[in-house]
UniProtKB/Swiss-Prot annotation:
Ranges of Low complexity composition bias in the record: 356-394
WD repeat spans: 458-486, 500-528, 540-568, 580-608, 620-648, 660-688, 700-730
Gene behind this protein: mhkB
Function according to Swiss-Prot or TrEMBL: Catalyzes its autophosphorylation, which is needed for enzymatic activity and phosphorylates myosin II heavy chain at a threonine in the C-terminal tail region. This phosphorylation is critical in regulating the assembly and disassembly of myosin II filament. Participates in control of myosin localization.
Name the record gives this protein: Myosin heavy chain kinase B
Basic and acidic residues composition-biased segments: 395-404
PROSITE patterns for this protein: ALPHA_KINASE, WD_REPEATS_1, WD_REPEATS_2, WD_REPEATS_REGION
Species name: Dictyostelium discoideum (Social amoeba)
UniProt keyword Repeat present: yes
GO cellular component: actomyosin contractile ring; cytoplasm
Boundaries of every Alpha-type protein kinase domain copy: 124-328
Binding site for ATP: 298-303
Chain intervals with Polar residues compositional bias: 405-419
Length: 732
């Protein structure tokens, strides 16, 4: 039987519905406390609440001031107390025990300057009925953040109810308005992870781990913004991300967090997975929980998709073996220990999580930007893109005359090829390179025997994109900035840092006036190339922007929202939205009147820029297509299936498949009939496009090589990696 019950607290009365005879007093206390039904004193916990009835002192009926309160036991049900529909139950708050004032410390009033009242909500995962409790406290939050990520800012905070170092906290406040339940969900996840860490430690691994005791702070006296935040103890040291979209920051401590994720998967009977491990040393924070059914734990819970991504990328290490965990995705002995997760795990994408995060870092499309804007400076051949394909802001006549790619879809009779007709089945490889150099100056060939590492630039944040513009190198970083380097006297010097994005910068391109940057914050920023300042922001994508690309009329952008947007360079308005891909668009490339797009749906689509329609789809890769580039009548595509495919653009057939990398192919660039490929196996391979053989392998990075750029004037190739370094490889 379901019925309603009236409850009275002081001068307030409320009605709770859908209660039954089996409802316990403990359950009612939880409803009243968590639902904030009454305005209880600050600091009132669930166990402080008492439910009972009033026993009249005299012969008259009803409750009076002299009535006696009779408390029910927590385990009593409504049937036990013989509740009758229509009766009123009374709520009281247990009085605290009197204190001896002589034992209280002297209050330093000056210490309270700048302090504010707050309610601290804590979640206890260890009780059989895991529950929230709250206490009143006094805190002092610094007005200026000391650090920030893609979605939150971090503030030094003092909990004045604690003494010494134990009162030092970090408050994390969202940059944008965040629903109140999200903060509670994050704390709940971290405390559940803390419980799993204790179970992991009980198996006596080489290193014990700890998830910080987190809480939710609700500020009592604030009325405008930032009414709530997450908080956790402050830990001194360097903050690192071990297990997210930015890859590994360090090889020193990566085995432990990866084995912990594996441990949670196996010991939950494949029903739960704790991922996104990060923190200081072995003190972890901000995890994400995936569940098999995808229920609970916020939009970051990818369910079985999250499991699949982990299973596809995890490489068991010595600790996994020590803990007798079942082997996942066995690799060769040459494989490094640890896990290199898919780049798009950090991003907040409910359908694919193609980025954040953010935090989250996945910029596999970067080769396209090396092919941009080659016609801006006819006398300058400094960028590798300027020696490949005429795709940018030069005159239409020059594009028509010089660009060989305008003939890619032209039949022998001069008419546009109808891709629906029967195509040639020829598998021949056309490697003859047309004369498409910007000037007539003869290029010097690259002597592979002389290539060596000449400089290493180390930084705190991961660099995920490189773009060369004249004498400057622009780098997109995971700390939401663009760093500008000048190459002087064989040394790279950071001369400026551009800030404005609220998420990692994933792609950059430029023309003679502007620099364009795409970010996981879903926006594209337009920067004045001379003054290096942001002058406009393009908004339209619903999810992270992974790739941006230019021609003389339009800016093209690909996103996790599965679309390609076409922006008019004169008005900076979105003119077209191209929809055909089934998953995130990761890479773009232009040749003549055709746009090529690679996607996580494993395909490459060919778009006619006259009609803005998809003419054809190239299929062959078995996993995500991460990078594409064009030379002559061949298109080259790299994929997470570890291969590079060569497509003949006359027959639209795959003419060859290059194998050699042990892990994903992240990025490619072409220079002097050589194909440079960056991979998740930490190496750079150089392929001869005449023989289609790998001639050289460059080793030196300690983690995924994310992006490459060739600087021909400087006779070097530049690489950036998840190991937080930029390396310069030069030749004679």
């Amino acid at each position: 039987m379901i019925f309603k019950v009236w409850f009275s607290y002081e001068d307030e009365e409320v009605e709770l519905s859908e209660l039954t005879n089996d409802t316990t007093v403990s359950a009612i206390r939880k409803i009243l406390h968590e639902g904030k039904i009454f305005r209880f004193p600050y600091g009132t916990s669930q166990t402080d609440l008492q439910i009972g009835k009033m026993l009249p002192s005299g012969s008259g009926g009803g409750a009076t001031a002299d009535s006696k309160f009779e408390k029910f036991k927590a385990r009593n049900t409504l049937a036990d107390i013989q509740y009758k529909v229509g009766d009123t139950l009374y709520v009281r708050v247990k009085k605290s025990k009197p204190t001896n004032d002589s034992l209280l410390p002297t209050l330093n009033i000056a210490f309270l300057d700048g302090s504010e009242r707050a309610i601290k909500w804590e979640y206890d995962p260890y009780t059989t009925t895991a529950q929230w409790t709250c206490t009143a406290t006094l805190v002092k939050v610094e007005p200026v953040p000391f650090a920030e990520g893609a979605f939150r800012k971090a503030y030094h905070t003092l909990d004045l109810s604690k003494s010494g170092a134990s009162g030092r906290y970090v408050s994390k406040i969202g940059k944008k308005p965040t629903p109140r339940p999200s903060y509670f969900e994050d704390v709940k996840m971290q405390m559940i992870a803390k419980k799993w860490a204790d179970k992991y430690n009980s198996f006596k691994p080489p290193k014990k781990i700890e998830f910080l005791q987190s809480c939710v702070l609700e500020f009592v006296d604030r009325t405008s913004s930032d009414l709530i935040c997450g908080a956790e103890p402050y830990v001194e040291g360097q903050y690192r991300k071990y297990n997210n979209n930015s890859g590994f920051v360090s090889n020193d401590e990566r085995n432990t967090p990866q084995s912990f994720s594996h441990f949670t998967y196996e010991h939950s009977n494949h029903q739960l997975l704790i991922i996104d491990i990060q923190g200081v040393g072995d003190h972890y924070t901000d995890p994400q929980i995936h569940t098999y059914d995808g229920v609970g734990f916020g939009i970051g819970n990818l369910g079985q998709k999250g499991f699949e991504k982990f299973l596809d990328t995890h490489k068991c290490n010595a600790i996994c073996q020590y803990l007798n965990l079942q082997s996942i995705n066995p690799k060769s002995e040459k494989s490094d220990c640890g896990t290199v997760p898919r780049p798009d795990l950090i991003f907040p994408d409910t359908s694919e999580r193609d980025n954040n995060n953010n935090n989250n870092n996945n910029n596999n499309n970067n080769n396209n930007n090396n092919n941009n804007n080659s016609n801006n400076n006819n006398n300058n051949n400094s960028s590798i893109s300027k020696s490949l394909v005429e795709i940018s802001s030069g005159s239409k006549e020059r594009n028509d005359r010089d660009s060989p790619s305008r003939q890619l879809f032209v039949s022998n009779d001069g008419n546009t090829l109808n891709t629906n007709k029967e195509r040639s089945k020829s598998k021949s490889i056309d490697l003859e390179k047309p004369e498409i150099l910007i000037n007539n100056k003869k290029k010097e060939s690259i002597n592979l025997e002389t290539i060596k590492l000449i400089e290493t630039i180390k930084g705190y944040h991961v660099t995920s994109h490189l773009c060369i513009c004249d004498n400057l190198l622009f780098t997109g970083c995971s700390d939401n900035s663009i760093r500008v380097y000048d190459y002087k006297s064989q040394n790279m010097e950071c001369v400026q840092t551009l800030k404005g994005h609220e998420g990692p910068v994933e792609s950059i391109c430029y023309n003679d006036q502007y620099l364009f940057s795409g970010s996981s914050d879903h926006s594209i920023k337009v920067w004045d190339l001379k003054k290096l300042r942001c002058i406009f922001t393009l908004e339209g994508h619903d999810k992270p922007v992974h790739t941006v690309l230019l021609n003389d009329k339009y800016l093209f952008s690909g996103s996790s929202d599965k679309t390609i947007k076409v922006w008019d360079l004169k008005t900076l308005e979105c003119k077209y939205t191209l929809e055909s891909h089934a998953r995130a668009v990761k890479t773009l490339c232009i040749s003549g009147q055709y746009l090529f797009s690679g996607s996580n749906d494993k395909t490459i689509k060919v778009w006619d820029l006259k009609t803005f329609r998809c003419n054809y789809t190239l299929k062959g890769h078995t996993k995500w297509v991460t990078t594409i580039c064009i030379l002559g009548t061949n298109l080259y595509s790299g994929s997470y299936d570890k291969t590079i495919r060569v497509w003949n653009l006359k027959s639209l057939e795959c003419s060859a498949t290059l194998r050699g990398h042990d892990r994903w192919v992240e990025h490619m660039v072409i220079c002097d009939k050589l194909l440079f490929t960056a991979s998740d196996d930490n190496t750079i391979k150089i392929w001869d496009l005449e023989t289609l053989r790998c001639n050289t392998t460059l080793e030196g990075h300690n983690a995924t090589v994310q992006c490459l750029a060739v600087w021909e004037d400087k006779k070097c190739v530049i690489s950036c990696s998840h190991d937080q370094s930029i390396r310069v490889w030069g030749w004679n």
